Amino acid sequence: MDDLDALLADLESTTSHISKRPVFLSEETPYSYPTGNHTYQEIAVPPPVPPPPSSEALNGTILDPLDQWQPSSSRFIHQQPQSSSPVYGSSAKTSSVSNPQDSVGSPCSRVGEEEHVYSFPNKQKSAEPSPTVMSTSLGSNLSELDRLLLELNAVQHNPPGFPADEANSSPPLPGALSPLYGVPETNSPLGGKAGPLTKEKPKRNGGRGLEDVRPSVESLLDELESSVPSPVPAITVNQGEMSSPQRVTSTQQQTRISASSATRELDELMASLSDFKIQGLEQRADGERCWAAGWPRDGGRSSPGGQDEGGFMAQGKTGSSSPPGGPPKPGSQLDSMLGSLQSDLNKLGVATVAKGVCGACKKPIAGQVVTAMGKTWHPEHFVCTHCQEEIGSRNFFERDGQPYCEKDYHNLFSPRCYYCNGPILDKVVTALDRTWHPEHFFCAQCGAFFGPEGFHEKDGKAYCRKDYFDMFAPKCGGCARAILENYISALNTLWHPECFVCRECFTPFVNGSFFEHDGQPYCEVHYHERRGSLCSGCQKPITGRCITAMAKKFHPEHFVCAFCLKQLNKGTFKEQNDKPYCQNCFLKLFC
């Protein structure tokens, strides 16, 4: 356990220098060989029954084929001349001298063209701890190991860069090389005490490493895997495969993943998950998804590399090998999202019954629906025919089976006011074969609105009663006002009955008789007065003979002397102070 604590401390101190490739040591270090004493002894006669695989083999702790054991001083190759079967070697934990019955092997069939030697190193323990102390120590070390692996994963996203030639190069693979056992030089030729075996690691680029003293990450992980048993076997072996130790060991050796390949697969998995989050919506055009659940698709058995037998990666990506295309168009992306949503709801058992077919796009309606004009519409497709604006919850008008918004409908189809030429939205007045706003239908002369008495029309214009009669009704010859009701027609004009009187005395004409002078009606007296046919003596009109004297007219019997009152019929008279006198009276009075 002290060695395990030291390995954990060294692993924690070297995590900041880890690259994606494991660091191979250029020379031997104290960490390159186990601390326990190992013995080696050639097997002369193979036993009939091979031993069962150890707990490390069942837990998946199989040494890398690259690992080779060599002694600290020299290396010898031992091959059995007559048998090419691999040798299973086991070493004791406490004894320092090997026992021929402690290490056994079995002949097996030849695998490939090379010989394999499988070794299970065991560590020497100074003292056997109690089970309680052992479990507590293992639990704490496992927790520390989990924390260090998390730090290792974090370092993998920001690794220190190697030079181009080292980053692109990979460690040399074993190829067709045979596994080698290194036997140290001892005093005894055979069966003596063997020195500590050292584990030789291949070197990167001719033996160059990041550090010559620090152990590599792969060697540390190998030591940890061999020291701490895993509670759950990583590899499942069928019962039919347990009959042959060589088959079990070969399967375990093929499925073992090194630390560098595991971290590389972890990086690929994280990158695939990131791509799935970004391009998840773009790759669901057919409505199918591959969920990143961690189990293989189609019921296939998952392989250690993270790829199932069906050939799909359980990383959230589809099985298509074609690269993802460019971003789809907004319309196709919307249709793809709607189709994926509907398929997902159907998979979950949620029934998505279409509410109808849109009258515009002829597609089924699954969300909000607008019902109008006996049809169903998508809300975004129920628009005005003229301006193409969404009508929504506003009022609309129908014309020839097409919807129109209120503004466009009135501008296109509403009646126009004759006065302002604007559309009539509410009440309308129809007059004179035209349409009007109620507030624009008024008297053309005074601008007053028409009352209950109505209006009068003249030359296509509307007038109130007063203005119409004032402007167009016949005028009275006496008062010059419009004649609205009864009238008298005389002297080529119309008269109010109360206005047809003598223009001098304003006396109504009795029996309808009147005298006209200069276009005006007069009574008889004023008529003769105006004409001068009134007797100057009696002040009555002269209808018969008359005498004209002193610029006056007289009845013959009324032309008399102003003093004696005798009729002046002879035609001679004297005038004095505008009065007529006979000859005798004139002589008497003025002579």
Swiss-Prot record:
Residues annotated with Phosphothreonine modification: 132
Compositionally skewed regions (Polar residues) per UniProt: 69-106, 121-137, 236-260
Residue numbers spanned by region Required for binding to PARVA and ILK: 262-315
Short motif (LD motif 5): ranges: 333-345
Regions of compositional bias (Pro residues) in chain numbering: 45-54
Post-translational modification: Phosphorylated by MAPK1/ERK2. Phosphorylated on tyrosine residues during integrin-mediated cell adhesion, embryonic development, fibroblast transformation and following stimulation of cells by mitogens. Phosphorylation at Ser-244 by CDK5 reduces its interaction with PTK2/FAK1 in matrix-cell focal adhesions (MCFA) during oligodendrocytes (OLs) differentiation. Phosphorylation at Tyr-31 and Tyr-118 by PTK6 promote the activation of RAC1 via CRK/CrKII, thereby promoting migration and invasion. Phosphorylation at Ser-250 by SLK is required for PXN redistribution and cell motility.
Keyword Phosphoprotein: yes
Alphabetical keyword list: Acetylation, Cell adhesion, Cell junction, Cytoplasm, Cytoskeleton, LIM domain, Metal-binding, Phosphoprotein, Repeat, Zinc
Keyword Cell wall biogenesis/degradation: no
Coiled coil: none
LD motif 4 (motif): residue ranges: 265-276
PTM annotation (Phosphoserine): residues: 83, 85, 106, 119, 126, 130, 137, 140, 143, 230, 244, 250, 258, 261, 272, 303, 322, 332, 340, 533
Residue list for modification Phosphotyrosine: 31, 88, 118, 181
Placement of sequence motif LD motif 1: 3-15
Molecular function (Gene Ontology), one example: protein phosphatase binding
Designated name of the protein: Paxillin
Source organism per UniProt: Homo sapiens
